Amino acid sequence: MMNPVLEFPVTDEILTSFALAIGPDLQGYRNHIYRVLNFYCALRGNDGLPGEALQIAAAFHDLGIWTDNTLDYLPPSVRLVTDYLDSRQRGELKDEVSALILEHHKVRSYHSAYALTVEPFRRADLIDVSLGLVRFGLPRAFIKTVQSMFPDHGFHGMLIKLSARQFIRSPLHPLPMFRW
C-alpha cells in the first residue's frame, strides 16, 4: 500500500483563505479533507498528488456548512467554488469540480460525467465519514495510519451535532445533502 500524502498545497491555500469562516473547526475540516484525499489516492492507485480539480473540490466540498451555516451545504459549496474558479479564470474545471461536490453524498454509485474522479471521491468521503467501517477494499491498516496521521479534532462530533439540530428543525428532511 502506498504512503500517505502529507501536504496538499492547493487545498491548504484555499482553506487559509476561509480560515475565519471555518473558525475553530479548521483543523478538523483540514484533516477530514486530508484523509479523504489520501483515501481517494489509494482507491485510484495514485502515487502523489491528485489533480488540481480534485484538490479544489476537496477544499470546497463541505465549506457551505460554515459559510452558510447549514447542513444543506452542497449548493452553497458549489457557489463558492464557482466564484473561486471564475476569479482564477479556471472555468474549464467548473463542470468536474461541481460534479465532485454535488455527488459526493450520492447514496448509490455514480456513473455519469467524470465518474473516474467522482466515484472514488464519493467512496473516499464515505470511508472517512463512516470512520473506516466502510472500506471499499482499502486495508484497515492503511485507513488507521491515515486516521492517526490526520486526527479527527472533533470533526465527526461537529457533524453529529449539526445533524441532530437539522433533525429537530426538519424531521422529514434530516440529511439534505444526500442524493439518490
How does the language model describe each region?
Residues L15-T16:
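Glycine-rich, flexible beta-strand/loop modules in the N-terminal catalytic cores of phosphate-handling
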Residues L26, T67, L71, S87:
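Short gly/ser-rich anion-binding loops that grip negatively charged ligand groups
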Residues M2-P9, A19-D47, F60, Q89, ...:
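Divalent metal-dependent phosphate-bond-processing catalytic cores, especially two-metal-ion Mg2+/Mn2+ enzymes
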